Structures are given as C-alpha cells and as structure tokens.
Amino acid sequence: MQRILDLRRIYALTVDPRTLHGSVWKVDFKVVRQELIRYIKDLALFEGEFILSSGQKSSYYIDLRRVSLDCRAAPIIGKVMFDLICDLQDVDAIGGLTMGADPIACAIMHYAASVGRSYNAFVVRKQKKTHGLARLIEGPDIRGKRVVIVEDTSTTGNSPITAARRAEETGATVAAIAVMVDRETGARQAIEKAGYSYYAALRVTDILDRGTAD
C-alpha cells in the first residue's frame, strides 16, 4: 500500500495560474529517490560473475530494463530524471543510444508533459537503417535543437558519448549527458573529458549493500 501512496504523491501538482503549467511538488523527492533504489534492488540487481558490454568483469549486474520497462517504476524514473535535468535551459529533446536510453527518455517525456514541460524524445540507432528514410536518429527532427543525452547505466561512458557525437553530427547541440545509475568506474571522467556536462541520479554505491563497488 505504501508504494501506491508514494506513486500518487509523485504526481501531486500545484498549478501556477500565471503560466498554467504544473510545478513539481518537490517535498518528497528523497522519498521518491529511495523508492527507485528499492525497485532496482528488488527487480534488477543480480550477484555472480558477469561480463559487461564494455568487456569488463563484474561481481554484480544491474538489469535496469527490468525497472525502466516496469509500469510501476517508470513514473518514478520520469520524476527522478526530470528533477535531475529540469534546470538545464532551453532543452528541446531527450534521447540516447538504443535500447537502454529509450525507456528513460520516454519516462522523462511523459513526466515532463504532466508538469507542463515539453520535451520530445528521440532514439539513436546503433547503425543507420538501409531502407525507408535510412535514418540514424528516429523521432522528431533534432537538427538545430538543444538536447540531453540519457542512458540507464554507464560503465565507461562510451554509449552516451557515441549518442552525443551522433546527435551533434545531425546538427543538434548537446546540453548534457545524464544517466540513471553511475557504476563509478570512470564514466564521469570520460564524459567530462569529452567535453560534456555530466549528471547521475544514482551511484552504484547507493544500490549495493556495501561501501564500495567491485
């Protein structure tokens, strides 16, 4: 029952009559963030021996698509990630490299709409289509737009950097890169070295029941 109540509180709005836009009720942001951590622990955290997409070995694996595609958790992700990036100015669209970024971008888009903010979402393909419009980036055109690149989790920073470069090649300006979970294995340093502002909603040490990540 507590989770249902928490979800309802996420969407509690106060209306500003001057703008006719909803403003986010931020009083319980810490509660919402902790709720997201609980969902990740319950649904997405596995311990064992794993090979990550970066090729690195890990004693744990966080399958964030089990959370980002869950109908209960997606609204929470939308709020947490929106609060992370909402102060960035003049952002038009949010997206990243398929497929980890896709549900994150859509969750932010839907939550933002519920509070009067307009963000389009877009999908960066790993390879350009060879049929139809042969697009590398799907969704509303981002040429000339200011965008935020998102990712569910990042180990080395390579995926969001790739998405950012492709968005720039299309004619977009990248305002920042934002990830839901930073594995604390060098992604921040790589992304900032590449010239992008970096935001992370959670660190892996927020999720693991130990002081440091393996």
UniProtKB/Swiss-Prot annotation:
Cysteine pairings via disulfide bonds: none
Task: Name the keywords, alphabetized.
Answer: Glycosyltransferase, Magnesium, Pyrimidine biosynthesis, Transferase
Give GO terms for biological process. 'de novo' UMP biosynthetic process; pyrimidine nucleobase biosynthetic process
Which InterPro entries does the annotation name? OPRT (IPR023031), Or_phspho_trans_dom (IPR004467), PRibTrfase_dom (IPR000836), PRTase-like (IPR029057)
Q: Report which superkingdom the organism of origin falls in.
A: Bacteria
MF annotations from Gene Ontology:
magnesium ion binding; orotate phosphoribosyltransferase activity
Q: Report the EC number(s), separated by commas if there are several.
A: 2.4.2.10
Pfam families hit by this protein: Pribosyltran (PF00156)
Q: Which residues bind 5-phospho-alpha-D-ribose 1-diphosphate?
A: R125, K126, K129, H131, E151, D152, T153, S154, T155, T156, G157, N158, S159
The metabolic or biological pathway listed in the UniProt record of this protein is:
Pyrimidine metabolism; UMP biosynthesis via de novo pathway; UMP from orotate: step 1/2
Cofactor(s) named in the record: Mg(2+)
Q: Which reaction does it catalyse?
A: orotidine 5'-phosphate + diphosphate = orotate + 5-phospho-alpha-D-ribose 1-diphosphate
Binding residues annotated for orotate, in chain numbering: T155, R183
**Its biological purpose:** Catalyzes the transfer of a ribosyl phosphate group from 5-phosphoribose 1-diphosphate to orotate, leading to the formation of orotidine monophosphate (OMP).
Family, per entry? Belongs to the purine/pyrimidine phosphoribosyltransferase family. PyrE subfamily.
Instruction: Cite the record's note on assembly.
Output: Homodimer.
Q: What's this protein's name?
A: Orotate phosphoribosyltransferase
Native species of this protein?
Tropheryma whipplei (strain Twist) (Whipple's bacillus)
Q: Which gene encodes it?
A: pyrE
